[in-house]
């Protein structure tokens, strides 16, 4: 068993071969063309596409822990077309046409990830089964109906986003209290850690070098400083996501927000024959407090949710990965949706931080004059968006003129979060809004308009 197998279900189910040998840290000063800080999806996809564009590039990836240590190895395994910001927010900053172009690029991204994992023989349990949002009350169904109508107003059709009847939804997923649902084909279930580790092996085969156990202490134009040496590079890519606040001057750039997960033991075939999810569509329901799940390739439920506290000073610590209270609530939500799981064992409990910018906007940036580049701020929607950001970074850095470099997240800069204690008070107070909205809907059967308005205002929707 690998020493980090206890990080998550995904890490624990990798074989010794999939883990591979430990990579050494940086041992000396180094000169390269591109230095990438962070060996999660953002950094690895950037390295992959840079070397696709120009195989002669000298690319070094610096990782504080090991490949896939952060959210890239611990997430819910949704390779989706979801963006943290709404189409209206994108259109307001740019135009409706650019909002549609951005969302369409995300649709294409799911297929692009599937293409790469097939071409590079990355075994990550990729199943392009779509995403199902189950409405379990009339108010949830009405919200889904309005959302689908809104998307169709941008020119998308039932081929992209479709409202489902009760029977159609139950045929796909036999959760409790189903009244309808919504479906999009633009999502695939994956094994996150296998994707990260397989992608790392691929970029190494293409010529990149990955240095693990090499924390970066300072990023400057054309220079990255670590305690193990300095890397000089024409281009420096910051791909540090939730760990960004640990860098000098970046404390208020994003807020690390924790998302926690559980996994059941493998469930019997008779259970799945009754429950569905036969094509492994990712799923959630229409509540405001986010939950998310998938049927894994080995027939478990991997199920997660938000609700954990934000920690003072944007701190990230191993003990924050576990919360008896939140893990208990997640288990309760899963049993409420699928009571037939009965007393099935919960074999894994874990968590990790995602990066939330102040305006909920993800970004891609590149300044040719300084050689500094970055991408991130995915707020938990990073499995797909990291691929798009990796392609976009590669195009920007190599000067390749494509439609991607014109997408409205390129060059976007979010304002900084408020200083403490305002940040601590505000973010944790926000957590009560979806809880209150869900309770109001359960009691009254009507939406909590004022809570919804505040939530949308706070996250820029």
What would you call each of these model-derived segments?
Residues 1-34, 52-58, 453-459:
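Extreme N-terminal leader/targeting segments of oxidoreductases
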Residues 82-166:
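Dinucleotide-binding Rossmann-like beta1-alpha1 core, especially the glycine-rich loop
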Residues 38-44, 64:
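Glycine-rich Rossmann-fold phosphate-binding loop(s) that bind the pyrophosphate
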Residues 142, 149-154, 176-234, 239:
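Helical element adjacent to the flavin cofactor pocket in flavoenzyme catalytic cores
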Residues 319, 337-340, 357-362, 368, ...:
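Helix-rich C-terminal "cap"/substrate-channel and partner-interaction subdomain
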Residues 51, 387-407:
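Internal hydrophobic alpha-helix adjacent to the cofactor/substrate pocket in enzyme cavities
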